[in-house]
Amino acid sequence: GKAAVHALKVDTLQLDTIFFTVKQDTTLMKLRAGVINGPKNPQFSFSTTLTGEIRDRDAELLVDFKNGKGETGVLLGVNARPLFEGKGKGDGLAFTLIPEEPIIAFQKFHFNEKHNWIYVHKNMRVYANVDMWDDEGMGFRVHSVRGDTVSLQNIDVEIRRISLADLSSVLPYFPEITGLFSAEAHYVQTEKDLQLSVEAAIDELTYERQRIGDVTVGATWLPGEQGKQYLNAYLNHDEVEVMVADGKLLPTRTGKDSLEVNATLE
């Protein structure tokens, strides 16, 4: 089957072509959808295509974005495969990132030693081993701590030196933003509580060609006794602390939690 919409206009937004096709035979179903703005579009010229296949034992989806010059800004997908053998061979869903050399924000990446998978067990425990980097140290890392047999989840996430200029260039109608974005997060969940720590930084942030500067934010969420939860957060600008916030979440007898937050602006 096929479907398409041409010359769609909503206020000032104009999309030249939106299409969707589906083909099916006895072995698989193929899906293809996308948006195309031609070179005569008054706003942005680009093409975005989603290509998918649903097969007997797995399914696959790939995103392909090209700018008006035909340069590939995004080429990234995922293969999903159910595992139900049990006995150490898996009992959940296995996700594999594709292709071997994906492209994000016009940058080509590679996976270190086939570290490109995420596995979700039927009990919702997430196991991950993703190491995706380019030749200049820009990249992503998601690792689960497999040695932790007590926690329900124990995951580390790192994003290193992502160019916001390149990222905003693959997002049509997105404001012009520049800077280098990095972040680290650690998440631990047990049967009774959770712990989360996040720190993110943008070096030389600009918005629509106006300099904002170096920005760093951080937050920590920690469990306490008797169901209490504690929050600590901060905001720095050009290496100067401009805000500190402390809070706590207190359970009550009525079942409605009480949140108290104290913030200090410098």
Q: Where in the sequence are the language-model features?
A:
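Interface amphipathic segments
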Residues: 1-266
